[in-house]
Amino acid sequence: GLGDVYKRQEYLLDAPQSVHTGQKLHVNSAAGYWSAFRAVLHTAYRDRKIKENPNGFLDRIESIPTMREHLSQEELIRLAETPCEEEVLKRAFLFGCLTGLRKSDIKQLTWQQIQPYTNGKMFVTTRMQKTKQIVHNPISDEAYRLLGERHDGLIFDGFKDKMLQGPLKRWLLAAGITKKITFHC
């Protein structure tokens, strides 16, 4: 019943982040999981798996706005000059910093999307994975060099999400950067 649903919300707000840290799940993570759970309930109601839509009785878990840290130009230069254990991570991350493209779009990038302007400069055409909009972004010579040699398949082939944990953190630390930096999703 509805009491069980409330227990799930209470659990999320008190759930451990992992068994290793013992820290609670961040409220924004709990809000995201709760929202997904509410969507499942709505789908079950819409598909007539349950008779009532309990979402009208359930409170949302409010997320907290977060401040993202950014790299300064000096830090970006330092990072570019610092060796990284995963070369494809280094190229993809720096390309993202220079172009503003999301990680999801960079992972899918192919050479067919890289085109010259009439002035000889290059641009990248992407269908934003999140918004489905087609966007033409000019890219700098520095960003173009990060693409490497022209080839078939994905430009940043081998770039994996798991690289954003240990390898990215170690690379940032090696460059003397202690800010909490993430890859734009």
Give short role names for the model-derived ranges.
Residues 1-6:
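Short, small-residue-biased leader/transition segments that mark boundaries at the very start
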Residues 9-17, 38, 42, 59, ...:
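Amphipathic, well-packed alpha-helical segments that form the structural scaffold of globular domains
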Residues 16-25, 178-181:
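Short helix/loop segment immediately N-terminal to the Walker
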Residues 19-22, 61-70, 82-84, 104, ...:
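Basic, Lys/Arg-rich DNA-contacting stretches centered on the C-terminal catalytic core
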Residues 23-35, 46, 50-103, 107, ...:
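Basic, Lys/Arg- and aromatic-enriched nucleic-acid-binding interface segment
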Residues 40-43, 47, 112:
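Alpha-helix C-caps/helix-loop-beta hinges
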Residues 105-107, 180-185:
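Active-site-proximal segment of tyrosine recombinases
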Residues 138-179:
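Active-site/catalytic core of tyrosine-dependent DNA strand-transfer enzymes
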